Amino acid sequence: MHFVYIVRCSDGTLYTGYARDPKARVKVHNAGRGARYTSGRRPVRLVYTETFQSVGDALRREMALKRRSRAEKETLIGRRRRRPS
């Protein structure tokens, strides 16, 4: 499985990325070994994930999300929270 994830940084900003294991990737971010963007904004908290079968689909979605505005990402995060389990 391949995942696109969004984390909320300690300063309230959002970071979007790709990972095979998003929970493990968040641990890497929080250890200061993740993306440069998140290293100075720790701790980060996982707030959104999407699952994909192919790496290509996941990377295309990651790029699409990175082009979205913060407001659009917040709406997406809010929708995911309201979905029934």
Regions found by a protein language model. Name each.
Residues 1-85:
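GIY-YIG nuclease catalytic motif and its immediate N-terminal context
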